[in-house]
């Protein structure tokens, strides 16, 4: 798969994840945010909770369990730490979530997956 095709697939997965989150009461407040230490695919808010979300797409649902690793989560957490002042208010709960997507499957939302 070319870099452009992978990028397009990632964007489609992020749109699908954002749609799913909106259906479940979340408001998308940021997308595809890059900082020197990492990247966050989506930032969502529901009430006093702000979630920094890594989105992963795999062609086979069986591969989803291997889609996320500690290295990737550390980078998302580092990016979230830099971005938190921009999206979170005092006393908000901040967490790192993962959305796993595959063809013909409902998205799987894993909440609070990273604790430093």
UniProtKB/Swiss-Prot annotation:
Top-level taxon of the source organism? Bacteria
Known Pfam families for this protein? Answer: UPF0102
GO molecular function annotation: nucleic acid binding
Which InterPro entries does the entry mention? Restrct_endonuc-II-like (IPR011335), tRNA_endonuc-like_dom_sf (IPR011856), UPF0102_YraN-like (IPR003509)
Similarity comment: Belongs to the UPF0102 family.
Name it: UPF0102 protein Sala_0262
Q: Which organism is it from?
A: Sphingopyxis alaskensis (strain DSM 13593 / LMG 18877 / RB2256)
């Amino acid at each position: 798969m070319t870099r452009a095709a992978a990028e397009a697939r990632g964007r489609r997965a992020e749109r699908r994840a954002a749609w799913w989150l909106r259906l479940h009461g979340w408001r998308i407040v940021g997308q595809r945010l890059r900082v020197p230490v990492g990247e966050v695919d989506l930032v969502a808010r529901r009430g006093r909770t702000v979630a920094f979300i890594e989105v992963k797409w795999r062609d086979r649902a069986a591969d989803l369990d291997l889609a996320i690793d500690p290295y990737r989560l550390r980078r998302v957490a580092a990016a979230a730490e830099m971005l938190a002042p921009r999206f979170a208010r005092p006393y908000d709960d901040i967490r790192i979530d993962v959305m796993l997507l595959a063809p013909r499957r409902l998205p799987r939302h894993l909440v609070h997956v990273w604790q430093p």
